[in-house]
Amino acid sequence: MPAPEQASLVEEGQPQTRQEAASTGPGMEPETTATTILASVKEQELQFQRLTRELEVERQIVASQLERCRLGAESPSIASTSSTEKSFPWRSTDVPNTGVSKPRVSDAVQPNNYLIRTEPEQGTLYSPEQTSLHESEGSLGNSRSSTQMNSYSDSGYQEAGSFHNSQNVSKADNRQQHSFIGSTNNHVVRNSRAEGQTLVQPSVANRAMRRVSSVPSRAQSPSYVISTGVSPSRGSLRTSLGSGFGSPSVTDPRPLNPSAYSSTTLPAARAASPYSQRPASPTAIRRIGSVTSRQTSNPNGPTPQYQTTARVGSPLTLTDAQTRVASPSQGQVGSSSPKRSGMTAVPQHLGPSLQRTVHDMEQFGQQQYDIYERMVPPRPDSLTGLRSSYASQHSQLGQDLRSAVSPDLHITPIYEGRTYYSPVYRSPNHGTVELQGSQTALYRTGSVGIGNLQRTSSQRSTLTYQRNNYALNTTATYAEPYRPIQYRVQECNYNRLQHAVPADDGTTRSPSIDSIQKDPREFAWRDPELPEVIHMLQHQFPSVQANAAAYLQHLCFGDNKVKMEVCRLGGIKHLVDLLDHRVLEVQKNACGALRNLVFGKSTDENKIAMKNVGGIPALLRLLRKSIDAEVRELVTGVLWNLSSCDAVKMTIIRDALSTLTNTVIVPHSGWNNSSFDDDHKIKFQTSLVLRNTTGCLRNLSSAGEEARKQMRSCEGLVDSLLYVIHTCVNTSDYDSKTVENCVCTLRNLSYRLELEVPQARLLGLNELDDLLGKESPSKDSEPSCWGKKKKKKKRTPQEDQWDGVGPIPGLSKSPKGVEMLWHPSVVKPYLTLLAESSNPATLEGSAGSLQNLSAGNWKFAAYIRAAVRKEKGLPILVELLRMDNDRVVSSVATALRNMALDVRNKELIGKYAMRDLVNRLPGGNGPSVLSDETMAAICCALHEVTSKNMENAKALADSGGIEKLVNITKGRGDRSSLKVVKAAAQVLNTLWQYRDLRSIYKKDGWNQNHFITPVSTLERDRFKSHPSLSTTNQQMSPIIQSVGSTSSSPALLGIRDPRSEYDRTQPPMQYYNSQGDATHKGLYPGSSKPSPIYISSYSSPAREQNRRLQHQQLYYSQDDSNRKNFDAYRLYLQSPHSYEDPYFDDRVHFPASTDYSTQYGLKSTTNYVDFYSTKRPSYRAEQYPGSPDSWV
């Protein structure tokens, strides 16, 4: 994989190349003196003379080679061969390596940044540093790292951790066009298309062409070019059509007729050479081979005894072209071979009037050879030399042809690295593009690669080409998706899209070796199929595996169908296997692909599949052994995504909790560090590993009771999470995702502490105090003995309660571990976040933590309520009621309800917060309408605040709360759900119990009917608001049944059918939907039909039954038989004691057994909020019996 900085290196080279290309135009002003130019010309002339002599020797050798090969192949063309051991040195040993060639007067002046070689080594005018045609990571050819898949991108994934399509979009820099001056202009345009795409404009047609039948192997040639000379690599798009080696654009006063697009993956140049035809016989077609020499041990050594084919477009050909090649009757041209094997020249299409000038030679300078000199042998994991699975080069047909056309040299196909040992690439009909006459094949455009791939249909166009069935000449039109190609045809009599135009004289051509071996679709730009990519994950080369994983990551981004298909094809197992790979890049890309595959709520199957193939242990192994920050970030990101699946949570807790805590949480939090310096603070605040891990723990903390127990008992976890919050509070980092995750995790771990933590039970439940403003129901030392009351000594305040001042009873030492969850010291950071943070999730989590901690009758819940009052937290909570965020208001309202369990808190809330609570009720000009859950929470807070406090009840009436509550219960305005109606009816019922206030109510126009809502009305409203209920349920409704009396109603008596338990999978917030209301059906005494609307909410029916029997006649008469047996709405409230007396004198005489939640039918479990997971866990009502602080 290319490093991220690779892109910047390429981009840096582009402007310079454009400058070079632009500076070669004929309109440039000379920049050097005439003396310097003349000196340069003389020096060039001396070199050209020497080159002319060498080229004459080459011409003789090439002529004999061409004749022999043509006869051997029994065809009018000859095949080119690539060298195996030696290559021709293009300069003698006595000539220095480099030199500066001065510009000449006769042509456009060369800029000074062109370092032209002064010996025959002149090849191109650019070096790897100037353009992107360098063999660096990700480039095609013999790359050093070869981590790029040949068929995709030369830039690759710049960032393996990213899974956004946009990171690999082609660089659309709208590069300037380079015009090539001549009788007609040929343009190579670099537009905003993907890297490597080129636009070639043909100008002259019907040129009989020679064919270069084979291009040497990529292992030997890093910069092979085809056809018109356009270089294949990304930077080559700014090169000249007249260059045989992809040099920058040159001044070329001849008409050009490019016949094919360039390709970095094209195995052979299917182009013709104008040098090979005579004007009298334009249809004579010959094949020019690039017969290169064998490599010598000394690349700079003297010229060997034989030279190879005419390298049209090479600088060494140009001098001879002035004297010999310029004549259209010249048959063949001698040329020296490249410095190293495999350098293939590209024939040019020249008009009969062309005279190539000395200036052309300067355009082929040192830079191409700089590339060769910088090349190293291919590394073992590169794709060079890999045998193709389309047609093995060891096939009998291929061997025969090689022996025929190349008797003494072995041909290595250039595109052997294109395909892999995968049967999916095999095709029953291999073909090639065989064109007749002057037609050439349109092979492939653009440099290929993942990095520039965009998975949109607009990136492709369909071009047709011919397919030959191996060596047969039967052709068929075949359509294949290509990368979009922009071109214009100018006055040419052949069609690029229809390559079946017959030859001028009908000459039949035999296919080349590559034409026989390769399927043309292999050279066309196409997306690999998903099975192919998954198969590449098992490739023997790490580069292929890395790129296949990166491509999967790219494909899976935002595409659930692809994710499911990858899982079905077994790709997850292969990716998990790559996690143990020794190559870092493979590990990164595998993690990135897995992270995308398991992202989203609809990928639970992928998450389960990853768990089943051992993905979690593999991730943990990689996390423990890797020191690379990016790998650790990716691993924890995968675990975070996995943790959102309920079926995987416990596996992660069992296998990964300890590792995550000890490897990430504790070290990154700084909890165990003696000094927490500024550098660590910066690292801590920007740690993506810590963010991902805390997000994973946040999901795991909602997996249920067992998960919470294991997380609480994990050493260092609670301490580190709280330390993170303290640190962020001290550094004013209130809104980060890490803080949010920590707060929400602690909120879930604070759920039901007194029942799930043994230490909490020992510390708090055995010591019942009267912190609620009432006496303990038991005067005995044993809490389980209720009948026998034993006198005890009156405890001092320091022994049995804590009002927020002084030492905390029961905690003599500094808390640690799980004890820190309920210690009153946690209140301050929570309140700080509530006051300072602007992140709604953090606000909700902090309020929810206080809500959970203040719930219950145990001692530390009372301590928390006192600590909130001491830290001035009540005004902070009340102010948050005004937020326009539904979930924050719901959490804050429930927290206020729990805070009101403390007598002093209740007085403060009634005095200062009553109007804010009433304003959030529907109606009036208050903020936006809230959800039913939030409305029910506000009503429950009002109910608790007004219970046993007449002053607060009067404040509610004065603030206009009665009107809003009556509108809810009577169904006026927007119809509220049954849950809200019941909660509002409870508040009204509580208000009516204060007899001293009834006169005030009547003055305001209210009577008993407004405060006491019949159950039948609730039932009727319920069916009106839920029209989806079936008529069967309505017929079975208790409304139309005769039920005896209300005294026998199991709802009012608290008798619950043992079968009427909520299903464990039912989320607590879905109890009152249109279907959930009819979920639990059970027979009740005194009725011959089951009630379809039996909602269970009792936690201790026996105690409730005894209490309700005493007050069953309070509101209903015995003869009222049409009452709903519906237990969620209670009208059996105990009347306040002695209303005529001062209320607060009697408040301490209420027995604790008359707890408020069961008294008013409030559900017990949902007072604790546990919502921070993908799916909220469910808890049955009976899991938390006897809670005094649960809400509806």
Curated annotation (Swiss-Prot):
Keyword Phosphoprotein among record annotations: yes
Keyword DNA repair appears in the UniProt entry:
no
How this chain sits in the membrane, per its record, is: Peripheral membrane protein
Ranges of Basic and acidic residues compositional bias? 773-782
Q: Which SMART domains match?
A: ARM
Q: Mark out the compositionally biased spans (Low complexity).
A: 231-242, 325-338
Q: Where is this region: Disordered?
A: 1-31, 73-262, 290-310, 323-348, 773-810, 1058-1086
Residue ranges of ARM repeats: 415-455, 518-557, 560-599, 604-644, 660-702, 706-751, 815-855, 862-901, 950-993
Chain positions found as Phosphoserine = 75, 106, 132, 136, 139, 221, 231, 236, 273, 281, 314, 327, 337, 392, 403, 406, 422, 427, 438, 510, 512, 515, 776, 1045, 1091, 1100, 1135
Q: Which GO terms describe its molecular function?
A: cadherin binding
Cellular location(s): Cell junction, Desmosome; Cytoplasm, Cytoskeleton, Spindle; Midbody; Cell membrane
What are the Phosphothreonine sites (modified residues) in this protein? Answer: 84, 412, 1013, 1017
Q: What is its main location?
A: other
- Coiled coil ranges (UniProt) are 36-70
Gene Ontology cellular-component terms listed:
adherens junction; cell junction; cell-cell junction; cornified envelope; cytoplasm; cytoplasmic side of plasma membrane; cytoskeleton; desmosome
Q: Which UniProt keywords apply?
A: Cell adhesion, Cell junction, Cell membrane, Coiled coil, Cytoplasm, Cytoskeleton, Membrane, Methylation, Phosphoprotein, Repeat
Query: Which residues are modified to Phosphotyrosine?
Result: 372, 415, 478
Its tissue distribution reads: Expressed in salivary glands (at protein level). Expressed in arrector pili muscle (at protein level).
Family indicated by similarity? Belongs to the beta-catenin family.
Chain's role:
Plays a role as a regulator of Rho activity during cytokinesis. May play a role in junctional plaques.
The protein's name in its UniProt record: Plakophilin-4
